[in-house]
Amino acid sequence: MSAALLSLVQWLSPAFPTGAFAYSHGLEWAISEGEVRDAASARRWIADVLAFGAGRTDAILLAHALRGHDPGALSDLARALAPAAERLRETEEQGAAFAATVAALTGRDLPPRPLPVALGQAAAPLGLPVAEVLALMLHAFAANLVSAAVRFVPLGQTEGQATLAALHPRIGEIAAESAEAPLDALGSAALRGDLAAMRHETQEVRIFKT
């Protein structure tokens, strides 16, 4: 395994200090309302977010950031695509924490940007295949949502791992498609997930930031 790939794996690890564990992407609301109540419904919910929501849009933004597209313009797109205040907070806070940590490790100048753009700027010099970077990012995103479901549904640890494993084929497909997608392909249709993010903003009892 190359040093470049190991660096990317480290950056996308749950141990990397982006605070990802504190964000449920609206999943907490879906669980509290009974829409996500077991491993099967968690898998469906997360698969839809990956294929039709932020998973896909972030993957396309990341692909273009890796290829050197204007990071300022990509950041504006990322912000515009956030369907709720908490989603915007989620991508900006994690992106800022990610950029600050990678900058401290590498000595590079990495300004705070939405997470997919920050990751793309950081990972571009690694020279890794675009689809491979996208797949690892999507896997990290899915793993974080599965972790939220394990804690809050709750699911058993083995159920959680089985849920994540079942998403692997779809992650590979989305990564391959997004690696070649133009910016004109940006858009989402995860309407229930977007509504969950909006409803979470006024949820009285919660343990996640989003």
UniProtKB/Swiss-Prot annotation:
One example GO MF annotation: nickel cation binding
Pfam families reported in the protein's UniProt record: UreF
Keywords attached to this entry: Chaperone, Cytoplasm, Nickel insertion
Keyword Manganese in record: no
GO cellular component: cytoplasm
Subcellular location: Cytoplasm
Superkingdom of origin: Bacteria
InterPro entries, A to Z: UreF, UreF_sf
Protein purpose: Required for maturation of urease via the functional incorporation of the urease nickel metallocenter.
Similarity section: Belongs to the UreF family.
Subunit structure, as described in the record: UreD, UreF and UreG form a complex that acts as a GTP-hydrolysis-dependent molecular chaperone, activating the urease apoprotein by helping to assemble the nickel containing metallocenter of UreC. The UreE protein probably delivers the nickel.
Protein name in the entry: Urease accessory protein UreF
Species annotation: Cereibacter sphaeroides (strain ATCC 17023 / DSM 158 / JCM 6121 / CCUG 31486 / LMG 2827 / NBRC 12203 / NCIMB 8253 / ATH 2.4.1.) (Rhodobacter sphaeroides)
Encoding gene (name): ureF
